[in-house]
Every structure is written in structure tokens, then in C-alpha cells.
């Protein structure tokens, strides 16, 4: 997949995550994985700004954004199709509040018929060249 870099230059770690809402169902259970040193992948089919803000704040309250090595934002179908403001990238940056956390955005991962696959649990390294907004 081709990511667009929002902030940071490199991320490396095991991929965890998936649908922003469904993955939160694991909170408080033995099935929620450790986030330490991981790359968190989040995407969503439905949900407006208020729902996304609620989900993102729950991840923040769980301490996730202080533990991960990077964040991949996939396609947020309803948010993007309806042109909600703030957009998902702005909302994430506002709620995460950590300018040192590497974040990328890609529409290649999500619920579309042409979506690409990311293997959960696989080690992933993403990086970019200086001044290049894309993967290097």
C-alpha cells in the first residue's frame, strides 16, 4: 500500500488493530493485545465525527498512543464520502496530541472492494525520504 505521511519519518513494529470500533470491543478483556512498540492500524466503514472522536479518546484513555511506534489510518468511508469536518487526519492529530508519533494515511486499506490486505501480527517497516510525502 502507498501511505501518505502525516507526521514522522519512520515506523517499525508488529501490526495490531483493524476496524476502529470493533477493535475497542477487546478493551477490558484478556484478548486486547499489548500495544508496546506496535503499529496500530485503524479504519472504519461508518461513523461521523462525534463517533470517531469518542473512539479515539477511548484509545487515548487506554494509553495506546503513548505505547505505539506508529499509526496507520486506513479508509474512513463515511467520514471521507460525506466530507465531514474536521477530517479524520485533523481529528486524530488533535486527539492524539503527540507530534512525535509517526502517522500515515492510506485509502488502500479499508472496506472497499479493491482494498489491500495488511497481515495483523506481521512486522512492518515504513519510512520516507526527506521531503517526500510518500513511502521511501
Regions found by a protein language model. Give the residues of each.
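Structural motif
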Residues: 13-14, 38-40, 69-70, 101-104
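ATP/nucleoside-binding phosphotransfer catalytic cores, i.e., glycine-rich phosphate-binding loops
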Residues: 78-136
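Glycine-/acidic-rich phosphate or pyrophosphate-binding loops and their flanking alpha/beta elements
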Residues: 1-3, 27-33
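Glycine-rich, charged/polar anion/phosphate-binding loops
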Residues: 9-10, 22-28, 55-58
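Internal helical hairpin/lid segments
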Residues: 30-83, 87
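Buried hydrophobic positions in well-ordered alpha/beta secondary-structure cores of metabolic enzymes
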Residues: 23, 71, 121-124
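Solvent-exposed alpha-helices and their adjacent loops that cap or buttress functional pockets
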Residues: 7-8, 15, 32-34, 64-65, ...
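Conserved anion/nucleotide-ligand pocket segment
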Residues: 1-22
Amino acid at each position: 500500500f502507498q501511505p501518505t505521511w502525516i507526521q514522522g519519518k519512520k515506523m517499525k513494529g508488529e501490526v495490531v488493530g483493524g476496524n476502529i470500533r470493533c477493535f475497542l470491543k477487546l478493551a477490558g478483556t484478556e484478548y486486547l493485545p499489548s500495544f508496546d512498540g506496535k503499529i496500530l492500524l485503524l479504519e472504519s466503514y461508518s461513523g461521523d465525527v462525534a463517533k470517531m472522536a469518542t473512539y479515539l479518546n477511548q484509545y487515548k484513555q487506554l494509553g495506546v498512543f503513548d505505547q505505539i511506534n506508529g499509526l496507520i489510518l486506513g479508509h474512513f468511508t463515511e467520514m471521507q464520502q460525506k466530507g465531514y469536518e474536521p477530517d479524520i487526519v485533523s481529528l486524530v492529530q488533535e486527539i492524539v496530541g503527540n507530534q512525535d508519533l509517526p502517522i500515515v494515511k492510506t485509502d488502500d486499506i479499508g472496506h472497499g472492494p479493491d482494498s489491500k490486505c495488511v497481515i495483523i501480527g506481521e512486522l512492518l517497516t515504513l519510512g520516507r525520504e526527506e521531503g517526500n510525502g510518500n513511502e521511501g
